Amino acid sequence: MLMPDAGPPLDYYLVLPRPDDRSSATTVEGIVVEEFTRHHDFTTTGLDSAGWTPEAGWWSSAALSRGMRTDPEMLTRVLPTSRREAEDVHRALGGWQLPAEKVLRTHFLDHQPIATAPPLRLGPAQPPDGFHERRVYRVLFAKDLRAEQVASLRTAWRTPAGGTAASAATGRLDEHGDQFTWDLRRVGHSLAWCLDVTALLRTDATAALGSTLSELTNVLRRHGLIPVTTERFA
């Protein structure tokens, strides 16, 4: 069973012109709107997207969404944004009012499947005493973070001073008896990051798990990263 993203329904991005095409009159080339599809356990199964430019109007391209995450040149031109800012840009470029999200979804015509697999078992098979389930997720992101953005995350998440060498920032949340911890790490030497989230569930409120994953993903989007996929390891 597939479900839409548990957080804010759609993600918005601004696409900047190529460096050799930029002028004082054109600061934004277009807008991209995306939505992940997910299994009931919140792992990613696919991505829907639509793009808009003043010249072409609305169109859909899975290749564009892939390029936003894999093409180094494209990565420099894509900026995560809010719906409010996307509305302002859409209006400034002559598109008038940005359509409602229900209407935007009608432009999702080129679905990109994302391969999934049964959860890999990392860490202990049994949860600690007092919890009925242990889950581990990894959210992968493209683009890079500046030092001040990492510092902002450490402050927001109250990362202990020093921390661990493997993690750039960490956080913890206790909610109605459930415990969530997370670690932000750089992936290799490329422009990529991952957020590892461990959930120890005492209740049956899996909706809290979905909202926590979604909010953490959105926090990193607001800091400039582009989500790629959500995998489950336990």
Go through each PLM region and give its residues:
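Short, hydrophobic/proline-enriched secondary-structure or compact coil segments at domain edges
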Residues: D11-P17, Y137-V139, W193-L200
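Extended, charged low-complexity segments
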Residues: D174-A234
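Short, flexible, solvent-exposed loop/turn segments with mixed acidic/basic and small polar residues
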Residues: R66-M68, G123-F131, W182-S190
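Short acidic, S/G/P-rich loop/turn micro-motifs used as interaction or catalytic elements
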Residues: D21, D144-A147, L200-A207
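Long, hydrophilic "mature protein body" segments
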Residues: V15-R18, A56, S82-R83, V89, ...
